[in-house]
Amino acid sequence: MKLKRMLAAVVAVLLVLVMMFTGCGISKRPAENADKDNSQSGKPEIVNIGSQQMPDDEKVAIAKGFFEGELGTKVNVIEFQAGDIRNAMIANNIDFALLGSSSAALGIANGMDVELIWIHEILGDAERLVAKNGSNINSIKDLKGKKVATPFATTTHYSLLKALELNGISERDITLLDMQMPDVYAAWQRGDIDAAYAWEPTLSNLLKNGKTIISSKDMAAKGVVTLNVEIVRREFAKKYPDIVTKYIKALNKAVVLYNQNQIEAVRTVAKALNITEEEALKQMKGSIWLTAEQQLEPAYFGTSSKKGNLAGSLKDTADFLYKQKSIVSKPKLSTFEQAVNPSYIENALK
């Protein structure tokens, strides 16, 4: 009988441990009870975070457990490819989402009911147009008649189209293919494409047999700035504003770690993405991470009383997408001013 009681106790402990750890993992789908209140705390039982495989502050925050620590509730991280994450947000399958500024501008212009609450990074050398060795592509003008791949409605797509425009080349002059990053690399290996505008980790693989034609850093110098940003469902934010503020605190904590202990941040990203620390450092240095204080500067969010340039930048992106017929009607600046909300960053700094 004693043995049976001991075995029962061990099983009970194991069950408790399983229940503890299944609430904080990376999933492929949203938790069904995502927007239910925890009757004891008034918090959602589970927060669904839409993420992507990127070497950024969110990856650090996830790997370090900053979200669980700040939010005080279960966190379910769902990994997406670039185009799918916006659709998941539209379907209310996730509460938070990381996506490019072009995708955010497209979604907001088309009525996606979200608030933009954080800039993950200003994109630079982390996104580049790469031409395959032997393709005879040495400049943007050499893309005429070539097959070029990138995921549509993303920052790379936007940068590519702007690069073509600045060089007097029509989209019709090239064969432009809509591919997610894993498909880009597969097509590259098969010899199906001549060039691709890509981000990490696919970018590093392309550069093994290719060369950079232009980077998003080069495009930024020409006035074409692209970002990765965080959005939240407006309904969720209205119901749980304190959770959104704490979410910002977790992200800022990751940025501070990167600034104060780069080695630890790099090690964390390398392990999370299953790449070497050298690769992680190179990828992370390809973009600029902003602290919460920096995000409130006029060049970005600005403040609640005086909005900064971010809304205007999104409007410019949307205007270009409208010209490309990706958006049915031209959006007003006020549409983006209403979506850009610096108050959560302001509250996180109090």
Segments predicted by a language model, with ranges:
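Solvent-exposed, polar/charged alpha-helical surfaces in well-ordered, non-transmembrane soluble domains
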Residues: K59, G65, G69, N87, ...
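Pocket-lining segment of extracytoplasmic ligand-binding domains
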Residues: S102, L177, D183-L273, E278
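Solvent-exposed, acidic/flexible segments
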Residues: S51, V60, A82, A97, ...
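Phosphate-coordinating loops and pocket residues in cytosolic domains that bind phosphorylated ligands
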Residues: G145, K208, N341
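Conserved C-terminal helix/tail region of periplasmic/extracytoplasmic solute-binding proteins
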Residues: G312-K350
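Short, glycine-/small- and polar/acidic-enriched structural segments
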Residues: R29-S170, T175-D178, D194-Y197, S216
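Short, low-complexity disordered leader/linker segments with a strong preference
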Residues: M1-I46, I345-K350
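Secondary-structure end/capping motifs
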Residues: K239-S326
